[in-house]
Swiss-Prot record:
Active site: 86 (nucleophile), 176, 178
Highest taxon listed in the record's lineage: Bacteria
Gene that encodes the chain: guaA
Naturally occurring in which organism (per UniProt): Sinorhizobium medicae (strain WSM419)
GO cellular component: cytosol
Lineage per the UniProt record: Bacteria, Pseudomonadati, Pseudomonadota, Alphaproteobacteria, Hyphomicrobiales
Protein name: GMP synthase [glutamine-hydrolyzing]
Annotated InterPro entries: Class_I_gatase-like, GATASE, GMP_synth_C, GMP_synth_GATase, GMP_synthase, GMPS_ATP_PPase_dom, NAD/GMP_synthase, Rossmann-like_a/b/a_fold
The reaction(s) this protein catalyses: XMP + L-glutamine + ATP + H2O = GMP + L-glutamate + AMP + diphosphate + 2 H(+)
HAMAP family: GMP_synthase
């Protein structure tokens, strides 16, 4: 699906910061559409998007290095408002006649700004003489301002922490307003797009839904669409949106690989058939998948087997339907953003969903990707707009290879059943304790280790179950969830008493980094 037109767009020029996506999230949260474009193609992006405002991101680069990233001159010649963040401030000053020097030491962490001058960006937020927490992360610093700029706020280590040329509507900060450690940062960004750029903030999921439905109809016409429905939020929302647009021209195929959570496939099929009247084929291919996976211990080999078999099964089922012209995919905006290397050219990274990778080319189909402009949290809002229940929308992430990567070592039917039961009990206890929504992801892992235990009067030699729970904002970093010991004792007791094959339960207290959330 081609991207829909947005008359009020903010262009974010990405210089390679690890938190550029957070800038986009803050702009979107204020009801304004934005796109991230790497600095190498920013001029093309500027002409394509015709933005109402521009934000320049941070970067690990130094403006003092030869060949360091720069904003295209067309941005400063356009008369549009510009907001520079950290490196964005430095390159703005360097390009407009100011001076940037290497700092004697990096400034990283919490700092406090003092407002030196009233500024339109502070309206309803900060007042003259007030003091506010921000988050710094920089080495270089501005030491002389370009003509027309003045200081509006300072910190003890950054005399040019917040500068402005109000006549040209240029604003620039040395700190990071996009991160949660700058409490008023989201409001500053909202003030920039609303009060400075004059954008209304009427970009909503309701409006997106209407435009997306129209775009799908225009793209698909009277042709057939098939969708690989995994039971996850992304593919489910994509399927409902396409179904709203083209109705029975859509057929969904759920390939059950036998690696889902307890009763998951049956529950997904029931929900979509009973409540949404979708044409849905449930293909039980568990024997085929588990037969090939049995005894395989290498995690990458497991993933490759699952991906290959999925394509084979999906192709077979699509062939029985007589084929289709379009393949629906739940691609999200982070999947299609170009990753930026500030030392060389852009390297485009498009994550292929393990389920559908390679299918469009193999089956000679065009892609329909109605979610490719959205972040995950926006997909959840759209899902609610389409009528999906919160109990479904708010489910924890689940990996495409399913329980195969939560069963380290060789897989067997017996192990999968043991794991499935333990996982169901663990999640049940989390829900009973009212903790489910406070946790980003929770699951059980069946370890390829057996230990001696005593149950009744007998000796046991059974598997160890590890419990995992993490808190996170986006899955990029995570901390283990701090349960109280009473909860862990209760969950462990239930698992040992109710699941034959487990006689010991441990809790994983590893954060990410250094560990990953999943064990494989």
């Amino acid at each position: 699906m081609t991207q829909t037109a947005h008359p009020d767009t903010v262009l974010i020029v990405d210089f390679g910061s690890q938190v550029t996506q957070l800038i986009a999230r803050r702009v979107r949260e204020s009801g304004v559409y934005c796109e991230i474009v790497p600095f190498q193609s920013a001029e093309d992006g500027f002409h394509r998007l015709k933005p109402k405002a521009v934000i320049l991101s941070g970067s690990p680069a130094s403006t003092l290095d030869v060949g360091s990233p720069r904003a295209p001159s067309v941005i400063f010649e356009s008369g549009l408002p510009v907001f520079g963040i950290c490196y964005g401030q430095q390159t703005m000053c360097a390009q407009l006649g100011g001076k940037v020097e290497s700092g004697h030491h990096r400034e990283f962490g919490r700092a406090f700004l003092e407002v030196e001058k009233d500024c339109p960006l502070f309206e309803g937020l900060w007042s003259l003489g007030s003091r506010h927490q921000v988050w710094m992360s920089h080495g270089d610093r501005v030491t002389a301002l370009p003509d027309g700029f003045e200081v509006v706020a300072t910190s003890s280590n950054a005399p040019f922490a917040f500068i402005a040329d109000e006549k040209r509507r240029y604003y620039a900060v040395q700190f990071h307003p996009e991160v949660v450690h700058t409490p008023d940062g989201a409001k500053l960004i909202a003030n920039f797009v609303h009060k400075i750029a004059g954008i209304k903030g009427d970009w909503t999921m309701s409006a997106y839904r209407a435009k997306a439905v129209e775009a799908i109809r225009n793209q698909v016409g009277d042709k057939k669409v098939i969708c690989a429905l995994s039971g996850g939020v992304d593919s489910s929302v994509a399927a409902l949106l396409i179904h709203e647009a083209v109705g029975d021209q859509l057929t969904c195929i759920l390939v059950d690989h036998g690696l889902m959570r307890k009763d998951e496939a049956a529950n997904v099929v029931a929900m979509f058939k009973e409540h949404y009247n979708l044409h849905l084929l449930h293909v039980d291919a568990s024997d085929r998948f588990i037969g090939e996976l049995e005894g395989v211990s290498d995690p990458e080999t497991k993933r490759k087997i699952i991906g290959r078999l999925f394509i084979e099964v999906f192709e077979e089922e699509a062939g029985k339907l007589g084929g289709a012209d379009f393949l629906a995919q739940g691609t999200l905006y982070p999947d299609v953003i170009e990753s930026v290397s500030f030392t060389g050219g852009p390297s485009v990274t498009i994550k292929s969903h393990h389920n559908v990778g390679g299918l469009p080319e193999r089956m000679n189909m065009q892609l329909v990707e109605p979610l490719r402009e959205l972040f995950k949290d926006e997909v959840r809002v759209l899902g609610r707009e389409l009528g999906l229940p919160d109990s479904f929308i708010g489910r924890h992430p689940f990996p495409g290879p399913g329980l195969a990567i939560r069963c380290p070592g060789g897989i067997s039917r017996e192990k999968l059943e043991i794991l499935r039961e333990a996982d169901a009990i663990y999640l049940d206890e989390i829900r009973k304790a009212g903790l489910y929504d406070a946790i980003w992801q929770a699951f059980a892992v069946l370890l390829p280790v057996q230990t001696v235990g005593v149950m009744g009067d007998g000796r046991t030699y059974e598997f160890v179950c590890a419990l995992r729970a993490v808190t996170s904002v986006d899955g990029m970093t995570a901390d283990f969830y701090h349960y109280d010991m009473e909860f862990l004792g209760r969950a462990a007791t239930r698992i040992i008493n109710e699941v034959r094959g487990i006689n010991r339960v441990v809790y994983d207290v590893t954060s990410k980094p250094p560990g990953t959330i999943e064990w494989e």
